[in-house]
């Protein structure tokens, strides 16, 4: 039995088929302007179809034949005409108002709607001369789209003017906000897909308007592309009442201007008037703030464009709805090469744009089409902000050596590892007051980076309460960006970096997983950029992971997850770096190196609590430069073959490995132990797999070819096996790490549960060395008793034994 659908009482208010509706009234365009704007849009739509369908006859100079059709039809029509419509009107605004503007396309698979205008404005051909403004160039342009050896269906790094791919939905507003920071003359037009608006990251990022200072920052103009449908379903925002949608957007702090309809001429007039009003609102807010010197939060404008999905496609194909329905999403006319009726339909559709009026005899867009685009670097495809390396200035970095701590002897004093880093970052911010920002999800103070507030407060432009004076550290000109959304912060940082600036993000280790997929997308972006000669170098994304697993004993199981490193290792070796500095001075050395680097994602793992300190500054620099090495002071094998290699990576695993080494040397003075600490995790991979990898000769020299290696690791143990599985001595490598054995513990109990503690490691060594396997039975028994005693003490007192918590290296 067919389901009966009650027709919505809001249908007449929401349908795009009927008279055009707009919040802003007026007809700013004369008839000639309407004609030219519409011609440019027609050309964009023709190009979008050509990209999806054609491998021959690009200008339909002859009847369309099956051999002109691509063998495999890929791409997405649905949002392309709507994106091209927006781009066309932004071009007009740039020319009229002399705007510095870049464009971001949030809707999924919208590249045809962006690539078309890029081609017409000439920016595409300037970067890719084989796609010039000729019939042959146009054919090359069509063929490459969604084609092996060509380009994808998103605004990939190969797309001029793009810093937002849109492959994974949800980040367009946060990227736009980051781009606008410290760019007072820039307007970032960010088209939000109405399907994209259902994602968690996008839903949260409507709040970016609380992070833009109208004095020093540029503006973001959100444009909600309300075309009504996702792949196979209606979108939520398109199916709530007009009042509810307007109230929602007003509640987020915007002034929403609606443009709704499908009839081209009246929609052009409405969109032109609305874009003009939006620019006026932006300039008025900025002018007032800059004249008064008082930064208040404006009610920024945004545009809601309600128009048909797949606009200008046939309303129906084979008796089924297409334009204005989800069937327009991908390839509306299928099986074209084999179905003569479909071929005829496609040809009629393409000819409806009248390509003979849009391109001259040589295949070049006619002059009036080209004149609709801005000139030079005002073209959004060539705006330098969208290739941020053109604008990047080197950071002024103070000498990190001046922020270290004195370490007279290894393993004797404690210090909070991240606190001196905060002092270092404070002075980085002082020296770079216009191109460096610090990001954190309400955790910078918790992560002991709060020294930065002496140089720059936390940005805050919402309401203030009297109690904020008591340590709130809030200011409308702050440069520390805090919001409890890792997604939004990561997006802001990416947008900031890709437009030529520098930044640093810290977050809790367990919850960095929130941005796993964002990390993936940025790594992919950088990897492709490294292959494009025209893409300029950008600053690396520096990510400090702290509040780490081994000091989350008090917060419990949910806060214990070091698995982000596994995610990082999956990505291309040309962009990923992982560092696990064990103490203050090594952390400072690593941070300095990362801040100076380009085109990488640097992941630094360092806990914030008090930890033993092992290296003076000179030793730390030498050790970090090598990436790993033997700690002579903890080893006793000099000039001899070791009986065992004790290796470690991470602050707590290093402490426990040292304590185990001390226990073993006390019990078995003749035992030759080589102690190796690893800072640069990718040193473990062969040099053929990662540029930082050790040669096999160097690896074998350090880790031996046949001796047991006990490796105490910060993360999940199998990651070390993944990295080192090709090594000669891998069969003798025994890795200890986090194994999901956690709860509310003391630090040592958590270590015992996961067998990274000193006693478990010492027992492991005894079991691996035949010469002491039997004679060591008494020592093993004592170590097990000590484990039991430590547990009992923790259960009774809630803390570790003083001799454990206060352990020092006995050297």
Curated annotation (Swiss-Prot):
InterPro entries: Phosphoketolase, THDP-binding, Transketo_C/PFOR_II, Xul5P/Fru6P_PKetolase, Xul5P/Fru6P_PKetolase_C, Xul5P/Fru6P_PKetolase_CS, Xul5P/Fru6P_PKetolase_N, Xul5P/Fru6P_PKetolase_ThDP_BS. Gene3D superfamilies: 3.40.50.920, 3.40.50.970. One of its GO terms (molecular function) is aldehyde-lyase activity. Keywords: Lyase, Thiamine pyrophosphate. SUPFAM superfamilies: Thiamin diphosphate-binding fold (THDP-binding) (SSF52518). Its EC number is 4.1.2.-. The keyword Lyase applies. Its cofactor is thiamine diphosphate. Belongs to the XFP family. HAMAP family: Phosphoketolase (MF_01403). This is Probable phosphoketolase. It comes from Methylococcus capsulatus (strain ATCC 33009 / NCIMB 11132 / Bath). The lineage of its organism: Bacteria, Pseudomonadati, Pseudomonadota, Gammaproteobacteria, Methylococcales.
């Amino acid at each position: 039995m067919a389901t009966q659908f009650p027709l919505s009482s809001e249908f007449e208010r929401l349908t795009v088929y009927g008279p055009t509706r707009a919040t802003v009234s007026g007809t700013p365009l004369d008839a000639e302007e309407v004609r030219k704007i519409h011609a440019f849009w027609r050309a964009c739509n023709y190009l979008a179809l050509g990209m999806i369908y054609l491998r021959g006859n690009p200008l339909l100079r002859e009847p369309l034949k099956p051999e002109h059709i691509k063998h495999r039809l890929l791409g997405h029509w649905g949002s392309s005409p709507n994106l091209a419509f927006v781009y066309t009107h932004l071009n007009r605004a740039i020319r009229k108002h002399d705007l510095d503007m870049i464009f971001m396309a949030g809707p999924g698979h919208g590249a045809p709607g962006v690539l078309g205008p890029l081609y017409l404005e000439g920016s595409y051909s300037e970067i890719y001369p084989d796609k010039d403004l000729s019939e042959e160039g146009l054919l090359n342009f069509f063929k490459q789209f969604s084609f092996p050896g060509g380009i994808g269906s998103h605004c990939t790094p190969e797309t001029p003017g793009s810093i937002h791919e849109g492959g994974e939905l949800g980040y367009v507003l946060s990227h736009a906000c980051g781009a606008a920071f410290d760019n007072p003359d820039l307007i970032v037009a960010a088209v939000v897909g109405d399907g994209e608006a259902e994602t968690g990251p996008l839903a949260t990022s409507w709040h970016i308007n609380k992070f833009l200072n109208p004095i020093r920052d540029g503006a973001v103009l959100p444009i909600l592309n309300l075309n009504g449908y996702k792949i196979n379903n209606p979108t939520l925002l398109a199916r709530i009442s007009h009042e509810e949608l307007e109230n929602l957007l007003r509640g987020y702090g915007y002034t929403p201007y609606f443009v709704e309809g499908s009839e081209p001429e009246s929609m052009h007039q409405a969109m032109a008037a609305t874009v003009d009003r939006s620019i006026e609102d932006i300039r008025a807010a900025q002018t007032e703030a800059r004249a008064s010197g008082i930064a208040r939060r404006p009610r920024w404008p945004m545009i809601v464009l309600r128009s048909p999905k797949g606009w200008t496609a046939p309303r129906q194909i084979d008796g089924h709805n297409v334009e204005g329905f989800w069937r327009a999403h991908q390839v509306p006319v299928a099986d074209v090469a084999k179905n003569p009726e479909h071929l005829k339909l496609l040809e009629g559709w393409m000819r409806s744009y009248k390509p003979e009026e849009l391109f001259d005899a040589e295949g070049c867009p006619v002059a009036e089409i080209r004149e609709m685009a801005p000139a030079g670097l005002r073209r959004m495809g060539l705006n330098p902000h969208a290739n941020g390396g053109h604008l990047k200035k080197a950071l002024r970095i103070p000498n990190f050596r001046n922020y270290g701590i004195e370490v007279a002897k290894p393993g004797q004093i404690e210090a909070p590892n991240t606190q001196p880093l905060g002092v270092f970052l404070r002075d980085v911010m002082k020296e770079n007051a216009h191109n460096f920002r610090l990001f954190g999800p309400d955790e910078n103070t918790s992560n002991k980076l709060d020294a930065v507030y002496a140089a720059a407060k936390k940005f805050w432009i919402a309401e203030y309460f009297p109690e904020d004076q008591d340590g709130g550290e809030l200011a409308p000109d702050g440069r520390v960006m805090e919001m409890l959304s890792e997604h939004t912060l990561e997006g802001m940082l990416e947008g900031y970096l890709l437009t030529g600036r520098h930044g640093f993000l810290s977050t809790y280790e367990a919850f960095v997983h929130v941005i796993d997929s964002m990390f993936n997308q940025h790594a992919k972006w950088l990897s492709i950029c490294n292959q494009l000669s025209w893409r300029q170098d950008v600053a690396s994304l520096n990510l400090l992971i702290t509040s780490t697993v081994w000091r989350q004993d008090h917060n419990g199981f949910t806060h214990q997850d070091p698995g982000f490193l596994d995610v990082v290792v999956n990505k291309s070796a040309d962009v990923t770096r992982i560092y696990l500095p064990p103490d203050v001075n090594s952390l400072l050395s690593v941070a300095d190196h990362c801040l100076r680097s380009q085109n990488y994602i640097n992941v630094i793992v360092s806990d914030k609590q008090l930890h033993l300190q092992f290296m003076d500054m000179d030793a730390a620099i030498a050790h970090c430069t090598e990436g790993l090495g033997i700690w002579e002071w903890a080893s006793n094998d000099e000039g001899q073959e070791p009986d065992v290699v004790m290796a470690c990576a991470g602050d707590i695993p290093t402490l426990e490995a040292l304590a185990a080494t001390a226990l073993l040397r006390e019990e078995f003075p003749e035992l030759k132990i080589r102690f190796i600490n690893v800072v640069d995790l990718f040193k473990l991979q062969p040099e053929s797999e990662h540029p930082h990898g050790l040669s096999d000769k160097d690896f074998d020299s350090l880790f031996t070819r046949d001796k047991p290696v006990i490796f105490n690791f910060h993360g999940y143990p199998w990651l070390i096996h993944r990295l080192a599985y090709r090594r000669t001595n891998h069969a003798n490598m025994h890795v200890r790490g986090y194994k999901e054995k956690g709860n509310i513990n003391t630090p040592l109990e958590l270590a015992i549960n996961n067998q990274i503690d000193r006693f478990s490691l010492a027992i492991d060594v005894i079991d691996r060395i035949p010469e002491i396997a039997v004679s060591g039975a008494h020592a093993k028994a004592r170590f097990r008793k000590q484990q039991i005693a430590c547990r009992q003490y923790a259960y009774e007192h809630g803390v570790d034994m003083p001799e454990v918590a206060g352990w020092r290296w006995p050297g």
